[in-house]
């Protein structure tokens, strides 16, 4: 329950940042802050700790503020003043998801029995462009059990054109045909 609530709160803050900022100019700054929080555990723990005073946290943000957009600095101060420093990373990840959605950019996962070539990746990206938007990232997962073809996952959609799936469909059709003949 706490995680879901934190996710909901993070998405509300992300939506607020999205609505007040120039999305394209602030995106790099958000990525910078994410990298700082992910790569320096001390900074993340400092901003998350309930034992550290808000004033100390705000001082740190102002130091980082020399390198990032002023709107982002003010936003981070509001988050800290609201005792939400522990979800800053979630907020910024949700913000980047909103930016990708706004720019019609998607990350896809492709499961295949062999690594995709650059040409195959480009073909898949071009095929998905009209329906989903620009593909900005491809994760190629290997699974020899699919025998051939591939399975694409985009957001919550699954496009399964694997040989294993095709053979299962044929198996089901043949079972139905045998059942209808025996009747």
UniProtKB/Swiss-Prot annotation:
InterPro entries: ATP_synth_OSCP/delta_N_sf (IPR026015), ATPase_OSCP/d_CS (IPR020781), ATPase_OSCP/dsu (IPR000711). Its main location: membrane. One of its GO terms (cellular component) is plasma membrane. The keyword Cytoplasm does not apply. It is found in: Cell inner membrane. GO terms for molecular function: proton-transporting ATP synthase activity, rotational mechanism. Keywords: ATP synthesis, Cell inner membrane, Cell membrane, CF(1), Hydrogen ion transport, Ion transport, Membrane, Transport. It is a peripheral membrane protein. Belongs to the ATPase delta chain family. F-type ATPases have 2 components, F(1) - the catalytic core - and F(0) - the membrane proton channel. F(1) has five subunits: alpha(3), beta(3), gamma(1), delta(1), epsilon(1). F(0) has three main subunits: a(1), b(2) and c(10-14). The alpha and beta chains form an alternating ring which encloses part of the gamma chain. F(1) is attached to F(0) by a central stalk formed by the gamma and epsilon chains, while a peripheral stalk is formed by the delta and b chains. F(1)F(0) ATP synthase produces ATP from ADP in the presence of a proton or sodium gradient. F-type ATPases consist of two structural domains, F(1) containing the extramembraneous catalytic core and F(0) containing the membrane proton channel, linked together by a central stalk and a peripheral stalk. During catalysis, ATP synthesis in the catalytic domain of F(1) is coupled via a rotary mechanism of the central stalk subunits to proton translocation. This protein is part of the stalk that links CF(0) to CF(1). It either transmits conformational changes from CF(0) to CF(1) or is implicated in proton conduction. This is ATP synthase subunit delta. The gene is atpH.
């Amino acid at each position: 329950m706490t995680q879901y609530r934190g996710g909901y709160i993070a998405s509300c803050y992300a939506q607020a940042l999205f609505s007040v900022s120039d999305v394209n100019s602030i995106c790099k700054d958000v990525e910078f802050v994410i990298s700082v929080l992910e790569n320096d555990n001390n900074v993340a723990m400092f901003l998350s700790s309930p034992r550290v005073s808000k004033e100390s946290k705000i001082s740190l943000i102002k130091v980082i503020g020399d390198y990032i957009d002023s709107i982002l600095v003010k936003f981070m101060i509001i988050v800290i003043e609201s005792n939400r420093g522990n979800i800053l990373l979630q907020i910024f990840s949700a913000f980047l998801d909103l930016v990708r959605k706004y720019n019609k950019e998607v990350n896809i996962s492709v499961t295949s029995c062999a690594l995709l070539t650059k040409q195959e990746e480009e073909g898949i990206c071009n095929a998905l462009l009209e329906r989903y938007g620009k593909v900005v990232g491809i994760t190629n997962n290997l699974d020899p059990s699919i025998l051939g073809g591939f399975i694409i996952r985009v957001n919550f959609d699954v496009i399964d054109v694997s040989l294993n799936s095709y053979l299962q469909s044929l198996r089901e059709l043949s079972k139905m045909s045998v059942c209808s003949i025996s009747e």
